[in-house]
Amino acid sequence: MEAPSESVHNNHFPKFVAGMVVALILVMVWSWYGREKTSLPEVLRSELTSRDGLLFQELGTQPFTGFMIESYKDGILKSRSQVVEGLLHGVSDGYHPNGQLQVREHFEKNISHGLRTKWFASGIKMSEATVVEGQLDGTFQRWDETGTLVEQIELRAGKAHGFSRAFYPSGYLKAQASMQDGEVINQQSWPDNEMKVASIPTSDTP
């Protein structure tokens, strides 16, 4: 009865070894990736200089690639921005004095491009917008410190285009304007607890 048992164990042993090898490889790859991710230098903004629109370290001969950082007087991180070949390129974060994330936006070759989000010092989201090549484009939303939506604006190429809406703390609509290329087409306002967004006709959308 013991021989079959030994055979079973022997059959499983190669699979066990293979599994261990795969796990070891994954750990090594993850460790390498982590080192690569953090290997870029972090340099104070005050130690960088601008030449012909590109950022250089004070004695550097090549445009800077790494992270540009700023700190408050007490040493708490104020901002951290990725720089590639002298240009803002990647994620740029700003922080409140309490360490809470204040703003996060994305850059492509020194131009804001992508989602831009801001937060209150409490951690509650303040606003969110999409930026396309430096201009707001799409839906901009703003909240108060309780997390209640207070404003919503549709934009196109940096101009209000579509509905711009303001809300009461109750969530009911306070005012609405129909916009086209930054110009007001028509506007309405309501007392609190009267109008919900879902009940407003939208046939006059530009």
Regions found by a protein language model. Give the residues of each.
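Glycine/tyrosine- and acidic-biased, solvent-exposed loop/turn segments at the edges of beta-strands
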Residues: 2-206
